[in-house]
UniProtKB/Swiss-Prot annotation:
Superkingdom per UniProt: Eukaryota
Subunit structure: Interacts with SCYL1. Interacts with RCHY1 and RAB6A/RAB6.
Organism: Homo sapiens (Human)
Disease: Geroderma osteodysplasticum: A rare autosomal recessive disorder characterized by lax, wrinkled skin, joint laxity and a typical face with a prematurely aged appearance. Skeletal signs include severe osteoporosis leading to frequent fractures, malar and mandibular hypoplasia and a variable degree of growth retardation.
Record-linked InterPro entries: GORAB
Positions with biased composition (Basic and acidic residues): 11-27, 106-120
Descriptive protein name: RAB6-interacting golgin
Keywords: Coiled coil, Cytoplasm, Dwarfism, Golgi apparatus, Osteoporosis
Compartment(s): Cytoplasm; Golgi apparatus
KW rRNA-binding (keyword) present: no
Keyword Zinc: no
Amino acid sequence: MAQGWAGFSEEELRRLKQTKDPFEPQRRLPAKKSRQQLQREKALVEQSQKLGLQDGSTSLLPEQLLSAPKQRVNVQKPPFSSPTLPSHFTLTSPVGDGQPQGIESQPKELGLENSHDGHNNVEILPPKPDCKLEKKKVELQEKSRWEVLQQEQRLMEEKNKRKKALLAKAIAERSKRTQAETMKLKRIQKELQALDDMVSADIGILRNRIDQASLDYSYARKRFDRAEAEYIAAKLDIQRKTEIKEQLTEHLCTIIQQNELRKAKKLEELMQQLDVEADEETLELEVEVERLLHEQEVESRRPVVRLERPFQPAEESVTLEFAKENRKCQEQAVSPKVDDQCGNSSSIPFLSPNCPNQEGNDISAALAT
């Protein structure tokens, strides 16, 4: 045999249990026996063994027996038939001298049955002469069964080996797949980590820039608020100062107007006291001449003022503008009043702001005419 027998498989044990002989008699529990009965049984067993060795009788399988062996007893006792042994008791004993166990069990049962009958002698007929051939057939059948069982065992072992190989192959393939999947997952995780790192770096830079931009915006907003407040304050200050300037100019114009009115009244009184009447034509000519002279003087003064402006401070330029506006107001206020006075009475002369002694000249001219 190439391989050692590893034992029955589960299927074989199940099959043996199913094919168990249904006619196997149940063993009776041995009852307590006396000393004499034990001695008798021993004697019967020895006698049966001697007879079995001499005759070479062996037990056969129940299906191989044509008829059960008949045993005869003396005339003193009625005959009794020995029970047929099942196939399980036909196996040879592995220890001893090659005697079958069926022969030993049969005398024991006979001894148990005959122990109740007393001291009667038992005579067993010798078996048939074909027992040796039948024994050989049984051995051949047992050998064939043994070989069949070994072949089945070998087939089962080969199947188990193939199954183990298939399982090992499947496990190796699964392990390779799992390793490949783990490698893919690791690579994907690395790529995701790299993307996360890039995004986090970009986000950090953008956040720093946003923080700096928010600080700059807050500073610019503060400056804008301050500038807006200053602009509003300056605008209010300008409006207030312009109102003050307008009020002052109006007040100056009213003062000049009142002064001119007083002068006109004074001149009228003087003319009435002297009984002097002025011609309207001469007065108109003198007024036109004075206007032309005044315009020429103003035009001659303008380039001088333009040349002097870059060297003048801001306060002087403001005072010059204020003086110009006052002059314009004076001219606007005086010119219509003088026209009215000339229309009403020809004795009122034209007063020029550039000629402080104009009143005396006018009076002397009026007296000369």
